């Protein structure tokens, strides 16, 4: 038999014993009481006392009785009141006494056996019965409701049929009974309200509330039936044995588990027997401790998760701020191991750094707030290891972001395929036989080939001493060809052989071999590290050649630097078609496919002048200030430095509140400054004029009449002064004498002739109104008609209400470029000029 069946049998036995005890007590009370009214009243009061005791026991146990049990207690009080009234009217008949005696004799034997079995029951069986009753309640409730309803209906019909003949005799007592029933109903309602309030507060309050409604309807129907049949029902309930159902057994088993003393057990069983005269379905008992424990556990888990997340965030922030000084390579290697969770074989130094970092993070996680000691938090969260940190929410978020960034980097960068490195020397490239190097191959396998290769290299050293001259000639040939310093995406046999020859010669000629060949198992899958390793091999080979042949040191240094630069350039420029590295199954030495030697530009071979390391010869033009100077001349360099700083400070234009804008264009605007403008505007004009004089090569001379000058500035969209025009009032000008030009075929020769030839002007003065003292445009902004637009604005705004003609404008001592501009603007070479020092004198 299973444990559940045993628990059912035990619970049924216990309920039978408790029922027998209750019947014995009722029979004894009925026998001892006299036939008088007082005796009958005392006999009727006993179940009421038991009900009061049961209520106190419920308060002592702290049990939450269901609404069905409350309704049963209400029905019990009602039936007790009915019994009290009926007993006062009529005495007990002889037939009832006989039947009670028979029931007492039959049940006395079962009570003794039940008490013994009840005391023999262990706590383990009681707990099992409680568990089984709880698990089977939900299954049996639906079927039990229907059976109880059928039993109630059949009982009511029998009671009504039997009591119809005697209803006329009890009409006098019905009035008193009705009053008491109303009082009982009010008491029952109050009890029900209190019970529902307690039940609704519980997590299963809604379910109980629905069941409470069903019990209330059943109790109301029972009360109505009891009003109709008062006397006969009480007798039959006293005579008829109490029906034993599975629900009653469950309720009794639950109360027996809670009760620990025999007296409390008896009171609880008497309450159950009196309250279950009509079979009703009790609700499953919900322990208070289970709900409280669940809430406490949920709160603790939430607190723990929140504190864990906060500590992780704080630890990460602190680690980010403290570990800034560490090298980026170490940090990247540590971070790559955590998100990918791939076991890469690294060096001992990297492992120590990773272990040290994890230890520091564990120490920091114990202190969230630096000003407080969080020992209780440490005790709660002391079991958190690195594995839990990896599985936490914060680390997952960080790892997902880091993986996306790392994937983006890997897509942008190159992971070139690797090819086998073989040292087969091709005679077609070097055009020299080399039997020793042809027979050797740098192939590394998993079975200890490293030591064999070193032995071969040592043997080669002794043989290569005899052919040093040949090695020197080969070295010179390879150094003359700078193609060894450049890289490409594809490998061809002849460049590979030349590269292998270089590496082999460096290995053979070096007295102490500094670089070591690593097997493919130690090479990580990062393409950047592979290319870096290849660059180190090349650089080491070059350095070893420097030691053996010191005569070619500068060229070798240059080639090593170009090797590294070309490797980095190719790593950036190779398209991301090759996504992963492919290693051979038998662990051989491999190099990136992008390492290719090609023919480079033959600039070094055509060097005609020995520069001695100085590449900047001749005239150099500054890209910012536009000044043309000689870089090798210290005086020119100092002049350029002064002009450059002056130009930068003068060209800046922040903007003014009040600007006199004459015209606006897509590429800028033209403003005019007058002598009566604010001081900051005049100061800016003076600064610009000084810079223009230095650029044009004029001497610093004051204007004729400062109070009558007008300055036009062209401001670009990027807030820089790119054009300046200073105009003043004059009275006379002198016309330039145009000479006949020789036969010139091209425009370039014409411009060259105009700049080189001397020109003169007439001595006859002609009237002029406007004299352009200075007109300047930034050299980088020329050929954009900035000067022409400034002159147009000057002609329309120099005199209010009039537009000057080109014949009324004179230029002051123009430069060759200024003369060309005036000729193009005026349309003739015979334009007016004047001396800006003294406009009245002739030039």
Swiss-Prot record:
InterPro entries: AcTrfase_ESCO_Znf_dom (IPR028005), ESCO_Acetyltransf_dom (IPR028009). The keyword Ubl conjugation applies. Residues 1-78, 262-300, 546-584 are annotated as: Disordered. Phosphorylated during mitosis. It catalyses: L-lysyl-[protein] + acetyl-CoA = N(6)-acetyl-L-lysyl-[protein] + CoA + H(+). Keywords: Acyltransferase, Cell cycle, Chromosome, Isopeptide bond, Metal-binding, Nucleus, Phosphoprotein, Transferase, Ubl conjugation, Zinc, Zinc-finger. It is found in: Nucleus; Chromosome. The keyword Glycoprotein does not apply. Residues 566-584 have a biased composition (Basic and acidic residues). It is an enzyme of class 2 (transferase). Residues 18-28 have a biased composition (Acidic residues). Its EC number is 2.3.1.-. The modification Phosphoserine is found at residues 202, 415. There is a cross-link at residue 335 (Glycyl lysine isopeptide (Lys-Gly) (interchain with G-Cter in SUMO2)). GO terms for cellular component: chromatin; chromosome; nucleus. GO terms for molecular function: acetyltransferase activity; N-acetyltransferase activity; protein-lysine-acetyltransferase activity; zinc ion binding. Pfam families: Acetyltransf_13, zf-C2H2_3. PANTHER family: N-ACETYLTRANSFERASE ECO, N-ACETYLTRANSFERASE ESCO1. Belongs to the acetyltransferase family. ECO subfamily. The N-terminal region seems to be responsible for association with chromosomes, thus excluding any involvement of the Zn finger in this process. This is N-acetyltransferase ESCO1. It comes from Mus musculus (Mouse).
């Amino acid at each position: 038999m299973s444990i559940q069946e045993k628990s059912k049998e035990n619970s049924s036995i216990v309920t039978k014993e408790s029922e027998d005890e209750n019947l014995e007590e009722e029979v004894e009370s009925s026998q001892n009481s006299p036939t008088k009214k007082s005796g009958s009243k005392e006999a009727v009061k006993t179940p009421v006392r038991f009900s009061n005791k049961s209520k106190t026991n419920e308060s002592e146990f702290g049990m939450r009785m269901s609404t069905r049990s409350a309704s049963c207690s209400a029905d019990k009080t009602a039936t007790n009141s009915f019994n009290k009234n009926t007993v006062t009217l009529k005495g007990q008949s002889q037939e009832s006494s006989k039947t009670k005696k028979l029931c007492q004799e039959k049940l006395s034997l079962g009570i003794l056996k039940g008490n013994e079995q009840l005391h023999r029951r262990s706590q383990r069986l009681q707990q099992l019965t409680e568990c089984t009753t709880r698990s089977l309640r939900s299954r049996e409730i639906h079927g039990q409701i229907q059976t109880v309803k059928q039993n109630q209906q059949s009982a009511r019909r029998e009671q009504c049929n039997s009591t119809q003949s005697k209803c006329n005799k009890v009409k006098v007592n019905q009035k008193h009974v009705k009053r008491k029933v109303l009082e009982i109903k009010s008491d029952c309602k109050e009890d029900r309200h209190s019970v529902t309030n307690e039940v609704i507060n519980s997590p299963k309050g809604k379910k109980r509330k629905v069941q409470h409604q069903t019990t209330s309807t059943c109790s109301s129907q029972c009360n109505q039936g009891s009003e109709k049949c008062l006397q006969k029902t009480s007798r039959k309930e006293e005579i008829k044995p109490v029906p034993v159902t599975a629900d009653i057994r469950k309720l009794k088993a639950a109360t027996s588990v809670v009760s620990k003393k025999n007296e409390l057990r008896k009171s609880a069983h008497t309450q159950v027997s009196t309250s279950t005269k009509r079979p009703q379905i009790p609700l499953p008992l919900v322990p208070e401790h289970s709900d409280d424990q669940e809430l406490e556990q949920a709160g603790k888990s939430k607190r723990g998760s929140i504190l864990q997340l906060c500590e992780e965030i704080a630890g990460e922030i602190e680690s980010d701020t403290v570990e800034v000084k560490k090298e980026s390579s170490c940090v990247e290697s540590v971070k790559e191991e955590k998100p990918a969770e791939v076991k890469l074989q690294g060096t001992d130094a990297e492992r120590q750094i990773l272990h040290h970092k994890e230890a520091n993070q564990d120490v920091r996680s114990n202190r969230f707030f630096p000003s407080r000691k969080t020992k209780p938090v440490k005790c709660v969260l002391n079991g958190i290891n690195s594995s839990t940190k990896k599985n936490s929410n914060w680390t997952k978020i960080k790892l997902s972001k880091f993986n996306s960034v790392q994937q983006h980097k890997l897509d942008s960068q190159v992971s070139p395929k690797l090819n086998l490195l073989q040292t087969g020397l091709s005679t077609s490239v070097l055009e020299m036989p080399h039997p020793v190097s042809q027979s050797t191959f740098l192939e590394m396998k998993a079975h200890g080939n490293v030591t064999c290769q070193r032995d071969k290299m040592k043997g080669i050293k002794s043989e290569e001493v005899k052919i040093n001259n040949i090695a020197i000639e080969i070295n010179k040939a390879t150094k003359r060809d700078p193609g060894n310093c450049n890289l490409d995406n594809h490998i061809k046999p002849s460049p590979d052989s030349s590269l292998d020859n270089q590496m082999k010669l460096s290995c053979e000629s070096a007295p102490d071999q500094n670089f070591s060949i690593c097997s493919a198992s130690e090479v990580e899958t990062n393409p950047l590290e592979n290319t870096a390793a290849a660059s180190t091999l090349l650089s080491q080979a070059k350095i070893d050649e420097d030691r053996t042949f010191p005569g070619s040191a500068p060229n070798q240094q240059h080639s090593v630097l170009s090797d590294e630069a070309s490797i980095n350039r190719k790593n950036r420029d190779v398209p991301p078609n090759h996504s992963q590295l492919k290693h051979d199954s038998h662990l051989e030495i491999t190099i990136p496919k992008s390492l290719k030697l090609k023919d480079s530009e033959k600039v070094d071979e055509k060097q005609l002048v020995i520069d001695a390391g100085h590449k900047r010869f001749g005239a150099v033009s500054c890209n910012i200030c536009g000044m043309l100077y000689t870089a090798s001349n210290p005086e020119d360099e100092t002049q350029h430095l002064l002009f450059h700083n002056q130009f930068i400070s003068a060209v800046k234009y922040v903007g003014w509140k009040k600007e006199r804008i004459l015209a606006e264009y897509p590429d800028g605007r033209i403003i005019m400054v007058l002598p009566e403008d604010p001081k900051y505007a005049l100061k800016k004009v003076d600064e610009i004029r000084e810079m223009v004089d230095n650029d044009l090569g004029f001497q610093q001379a004051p204007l004729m009449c400062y109070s009558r000058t007008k300055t036009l500035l062209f401001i670009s969209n990027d807030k820089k002064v790119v054009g300046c025009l200073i105009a003043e009032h004059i009275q006379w000008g002198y016309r330039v004498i145009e000479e006949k030009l020789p036969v010139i075929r091209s425009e370039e020769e014409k411009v060259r002739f105009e700049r080189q030839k001397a020109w003169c002007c007439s001595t006859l003065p002609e009237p002029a109104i406007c004299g352009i003292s200075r007109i300047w445009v930034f050299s980088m902004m020329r050929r954009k008609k900035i000067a022409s637009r400034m002159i147009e604005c000057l002609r329309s705004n120099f005199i209010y209400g009039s537009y000057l003609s080109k014949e009324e404008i004179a230029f002051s001592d123009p430069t060759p470029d200024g003369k060309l501009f005036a000729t193009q603007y005026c349309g003739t070479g015979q334009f007016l000029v004047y001396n800006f020092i003294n406009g009245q004198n002739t030039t």
